């Protein structure tokens, strides 16, 4: 599953690209639901700051 690092700027690009809706706005940054994530990498591909990383 992917994890979103603290470099996240909360732009929402990742959530819009997630085919299984595994990403949502957290308290300060976006968060990935690891149980739902299918490791497709779409979030990492569209993130302008490279915050999503594979775990």
Curated annotation (Swiss-Prot):
Annotated InterPro entries? 4Fe4S_Fe-S-bd (IPR017896), 4Fe4S_Fe_S_CS (IPR017900), 7Fe_ferredoxin (IPR000813), PSI_iron-sulfur_center (IPR050157)
Q: Where does the sequence pass through the membrane?
A: none
Give the UniProt keywords, A-Z. Answer: 4Fe-4S, Electron transport, Iron, Iron-sulfur, Metal-binding, Repeat, Transport
**Which cofactors must be present for this protein to function?**
[4Fe-4S] cluster
Domain named 4Fe-4S ferredoxin-type: residues: 2-27, 28-55
**Does the entry feature the keyword Electron transport, yes or no?**
yes
Q: Where does [4Fe-4S] cluster 2 bind?
A: 18, 37, 40, 43
How and how many cofactors are bound, per the record note?
Binds 2 [4Fe-4S] clusters.
Sites where the protein binds [4Fe-4S] cluster 1: 8, 11, 14, 47
Q: Which PROSITE patterns match?
A: 4FE4S_FER_1 (PS00198), 4FE4S_FER_2 (PS51379)
Q: Which GO terms describe its molecular function?
A: 4 iron, 4 sulfur cluster binding; electron transfer activity; metal ion binding
Q: What is the stated purpose of this protein?
A: Ferredoxins are iron-sulfur proteins that transfer electrons in a wide variety of metabolic reactions.
Q: What is this protein called?
A: Ferredoxin-1
